[in-house]
């Protein structure tokens, strides 16, 4: 259901378990980021039996079809970031492209079991933004069942940049030893104290699964 008049205030009582938040997404980086930012703000209403639907994904469209043509298409990095964001947002993972035409790099994105596990986590909490959410830096945190936290570092700008991950806004202390795993690259990064720094390419995202040692 897509509504313009406080749809989120009455849809639960109508028996709906998920609802479209906005109009149609486009196959473009600008559209993906805009929709994701707006969906982040709707986090407090999401949860078990009440899922925010930012729209089906444009991963793999490559500029084809109506949505692809009006958007123009995205790079593989942009599609990867798109899938990562939807997983962090606990959004329905609806593929909008023809999977028969998938390239291996698209399959690698949409079949990432570690990201899907974050999306389907039993706690059912949507990611929230850590301060600050400005200057092209968007850092999201998603609490997971069992005490882990998933973090997403999104660089929406046109240039690569170093981004800082700080976990003291998530109930952990900066002096805690935190083990990080890059679930985008399926790679353990080791233990960290006092936060961590990451080089994030333009129009890209890194998702990390963290637990306190």
Task: Give the label of every model feature segment.
Residues 1-98:
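Glycan-recognition surfaces
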Residues 73-75, 136-141, 195-196:
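Generic recognition of flexible, low-complexity loop/linker segments
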Residues 81-131:
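Catalytic cores of secreted or luminal carbohydrate-active enzymes
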Residues 86-89, 94-96, 133-172:
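Carbohydrate-binding surface patches
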Residues 151, 180, 203:
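Hydrophobic, well-ordered secondary-structure elements that form the walls
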């Amino acid at each position: 259901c897509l509504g313009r008049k406080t749809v989120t205030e009455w849809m639960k009582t109508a028996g709906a378990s998920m609802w479209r938040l906005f109009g149609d997404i486009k196959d473009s980086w600008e559209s993906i980021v805009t929709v994701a930012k707006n969906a982040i703000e709707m986090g407090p209403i999401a949860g078990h039996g009440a899922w925010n639907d930012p729209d089906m994904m444009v991963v793999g469209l490559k500029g084809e079809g109506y949505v692809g043509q009006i958007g123009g298409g995205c790079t593989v990095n942009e599609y990867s970031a798109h899938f990562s964001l939807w997983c962090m947002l606990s959004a329905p993972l609806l593929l909008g492209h023809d999977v028969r035409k998938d390239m291996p790099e698209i399959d690698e994105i949409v079949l990432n079991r570690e990201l899907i596990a974050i999306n389907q986590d039993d706690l059912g909490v949507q990611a929230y933004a850590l301060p600050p959410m400005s200057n092209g830096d968007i850092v999201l945190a998603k609490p997971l069942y069992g005490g882990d936290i998933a973090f997403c570092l999104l660089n929406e700008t046109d240039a690569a940049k170093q981004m800082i991950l700080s976990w003291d806004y998530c109930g952990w202390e900066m002096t805690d030893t935190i083990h990080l795993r890059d679930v985008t690259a399926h790679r353990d990064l080791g233990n960290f104290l006092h936060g961590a720094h990451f080089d994030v390419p333009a129009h890209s995202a890194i998702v990390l699964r963290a637990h306190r040692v």
